[in-house]
């Protein structure tokens, strides 16, 4: 009987050790804890297709600089991210009626500080003008009397609609397009003399489609990119996210993601 009891105790000890080993392996490999990740609260992020910041990968899932930054930043705060494609013109309405939790899509904070609660900046981006390689447009002042294409509700649109107070010349026509992909077609086909957008997005398009545009040396502005939450949001998530951005900038995470 004593031998039997000793055998039971030994078996119990071995089972306990095996259980500890499994738990230790789970701790050492948190990325495999799918059930834990699935239990995390979800943040719904609204964006639109804008390579290299946000676009659909070959597997059909959202990818890009903003997607990776959002996944890392919200992950540090204990959230799981779900990116949804939105009508960019309705972004403010969507965040205010809680259809989405925030707007994250290479979104400029400048001039919009009072419209939203902001987290950031997490990056800085130049808003620039691009022309065809054979164009005689060399400076911003050369845009006088020309046709320029922009995406509607963006910072370049705002700058050109208020051209005089922003030190920009009077255009012959400003095309404000809902679909930003049409910007490049409009310029390529000669319907516009120039387009204005984030420099990184223009360079990504040229790389993806082997197209050569010339970017003017003088930028329209250098924009602070941030994450926009509803103005009336009642918690401190925007401030928490700003603090995480500061950590990610300090520890090199942002630089690592952007340089991939």
What are these regions (language model features)?
Residues 34-106, 176, 240:
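Extracytoplasmic small-molecule ligand-binding "clamshell" domains
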Residues 47-49, 124-131, 207-246:
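Periplasmic-binding protein-like
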Residues 7-20:
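Sec-dependent N-terminal signal peptides
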Residues 90-93, 106-115, 159-162, 186-221:
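A ligand-binding cleft/hinge motif common to bilobed small-molecule-binding domains
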Residues 23-26:
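C-terminal motif of bacterial Sec signal peptides marking the signal peptidase cleavage site
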């Amino acid at each position: 009987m004593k031998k039997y009891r000793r055998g039971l105790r030994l078996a119990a000890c071995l089972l306990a050790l095996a259980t500890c080993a499994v738990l230790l392996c789970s701790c050492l490999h948190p990325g495999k804890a799918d059930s834990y990740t699935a239990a995390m609260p979800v943040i719904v992020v609204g964006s639109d297709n804008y390579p290299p910041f946000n676009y659909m990968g070959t597997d059909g899932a959202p990818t890009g600089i903003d997607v990776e930054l959002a996944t890392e930043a919200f992950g540090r705060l204990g959230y799981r991210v779900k990116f949804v494609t939105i009508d960019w013109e309705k972004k403010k309405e969507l965040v205010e009626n809680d259809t989405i939790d925030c707007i994250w899509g290479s979104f400029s904070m400048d001039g919009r500080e009072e419209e939203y609660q902001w987290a950031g900046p997490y990056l800085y981006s130049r808003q620039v003008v691009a022309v065809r390689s054979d164009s005689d447009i060399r400076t911003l002042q050369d845009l006088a009397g020309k046709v320029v294409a922009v995406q509607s509700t963006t910072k370049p649109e705002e700058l050109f609609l208020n051209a005089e107070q922003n030190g920009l010349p009077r255009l012959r026509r400003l095309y404000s397009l809902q679909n930003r992909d049409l910007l490049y077609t409009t310029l390529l086909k000669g319907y516009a003399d120039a387009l204005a957008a984030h420099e990184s997005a223009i360079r990504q398009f040229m790389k993806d489609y082997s197209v050569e545009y010339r970017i003017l040396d003088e930028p329209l502005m250098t924009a602070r990119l941030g994450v926009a939450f509803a103005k009336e949001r009642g918690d401190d998530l925007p401030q928490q996210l700003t603090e995480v951005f500061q950590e990610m900038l300090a520890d090199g995470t942002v630089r690592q993601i952007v340089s991939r």
